[in-house]
């Protein structure tokens, strides 16, 4: 019986890769321990508690294991490596390295300091030059505001002419004592003065010139001539009435 069964079994061709369950049930791997599957001092299912938590259900050994099995085997197949990154570190026997910590978030104060101040100009740009204010751009008659001012035109301050301005005005007065509107505008732009200042200066200069040359004032002369003409016109009718009265008196005496 033994030989016949052996001959029958010898003709039977086993598959090249039989399932692991047949090896376990037949008792071919009875003397293998847990170290054979783990490859180290630690078990095959060892996982770091921090990264890969163990499942709640327990591991159950196969029910058909033959006598002589060293320890309970996992549900995975024969010689199968544990899946996942934890299995690689468990086989080598080294602890799993901790994952790299994320970079710290920047503080709001540091972010504000890193940004450039908008009030400060960039270092590459030059500072803005102040605007140039020419003398003719300035207002000559500037008076402080008086809150107690009731009305009327405020008193204007006296204009101080420079030597250059007086020299140019004297030259112009030497050639023309009276200026046209166009010429007055040209002189005002040239000397950085207003038209009113040019007009007043020429009026005062003409009065001084007449006083130096002892010439009568044209305004006083015209007023005196008008008064004399009015007096002569008022005396003429009275002289005409006197002869008429004398003739009338002689006529009455003759009667």
UniProtKB/Swiss-Prot annotation:
InterPro entries found in the cross-reference section? Antp_homeobox_Deformed_sf, HD, HD_metazoa, Homeobox_antennapedia, Homeobox_Antennapedia_CS, Homeobox_CS, Homeodomain-like_sf
Any one GO biological process: embryonic skeletal system morphogenesis
Naming one, the record's GO cellular component terms include:
nucleoplasm
DNA-binding region, as residue ranges, is located at 154-213
Spell out the subcellular localization from the entry. Nucleus
Q: Ranges of Low complexity compositional bias?
A: 222-234
> Which superkingdom, per the lineage?
Eukaryota
Q: Which family does it belong to?
A: Belongs to the Antp homeobox family. Deformed subfamily.
Q: Tell me what this protein is called.
A: Homeobox protein Hox-D4
Organism of this sequence: Saguinus labiatus (Red-chested mustached tamarin)
Q: Which gene encodes it?
A: HOXD4
